[in-house]
From Swiss-Prot:
Keywords: Cytoplasm, Fatty acid biosynthesis, Fatty acid metabolism, Isomerase, Lipid biosynthesis, Lipid metabolism, Lyase
Any one Gene Ontology BP term: unsaturated fatty acid biosynthetic process
Subunit structure: Homodimer.
Keyword Lyase: yes
Organism: Shewanella sediminis (strain HAW-EB3)
Name this protein carries in UniProt: 3-hydroxydecanoyl-[acyl-carrier-protein] dehydratase
Pfam families linked to this entry: FabA
Family: Belongs to the thioester dehydratase family. FabA subfamily.
Location within or outside the cell: Cytoplasm
Swiss-Prot/TrEMBL catalytic activity: a (3R)-hydroxyacyl-[ACP] = a (2E)-enoyl-[ACP] + H2O; (3R)-hydroxydecanoyl-[ACP] = (2E)-decenoyl-[ACP] + H2O; (2E)-decenoyl-[ACP] = (3Z)-decenoyl-[ACP]
Length: 171
């Protein structure tokens, strides 16, 4: 059976509840912390390094929760939420490939912010290319990524790292 190469919001919520890839697979956050509405493309051999790629989208509207509190009178999407979305997608990729355990962000080599997401924007697009996949005692994905708002690149990240752990008690 071939794997799906796109996912809708219902699928992403199912992943957050452990119902998409299995109860032991990495989960996406749910509710407000789920920072995407759909994954439009995912594969295991595309991207700049031939190890996989993901493209996902978040619909923007002025009623999103963060605009009401960040900042009063100057609403802007927090940069950390865009960065978290990129980590979420690396973890999702590892679960899609069959990894089991709990996903944890392990770091990022470099992040640059060159723009902002304002309430009048329409869509954020995340584009990730997988650089390295490790499937040993440690399961880890490393990716480079960009984030666009309405077609304009505003964030870039290099060496996003996510690990999948079967035991997080000592983490």
């Amino acid at each position: 059976m071939s794997k799906a190469n796109s996912f809708n919001k219902k699928d992403l919520i199912a992943c957050g509840h452990g119902q998409l890839f299995g109860k032991n697979s990495p989960r996406l956050p749910i509710d407000n912390m789920l920072m995407m509405d759909r994954i439009t493309k995912i594969n295991a051999d595309g991207g700049e390094f031939g190890k996989g790629e993901i493209v996902a989208e978040l619909d923007i509207n002025p009623d999103l929760w963060f605009f009401g509190c960040h900042f009063s009178g100057d609403p802007v999407m927090p940069g950390c939420l865009g960065l978290d979305a990129l980590w979420q997608l690396v973890g999702f990729f590892l679960g899609w490939e069959g990894a089991e355990g709990k996903g944890r962000a392990l770091g990022v080599g470099e992040v640059k912010f060159t723009g902002q997401v304002l309430p009048d924007a329409k869509k954020v697009t995340y584009k990730l290319t997988i650089k390295r996949k490790v499937y040993r005692k440690l399961v880890m994905g490393i990716a480079d990524a960009t984030m666009e708002v309405d077609g304009r690149e505003i964030y870039s990240a290099k060496d996003l790292k996510v690990g999948i752990f079967t035991d997080t008690s000592s983490f």
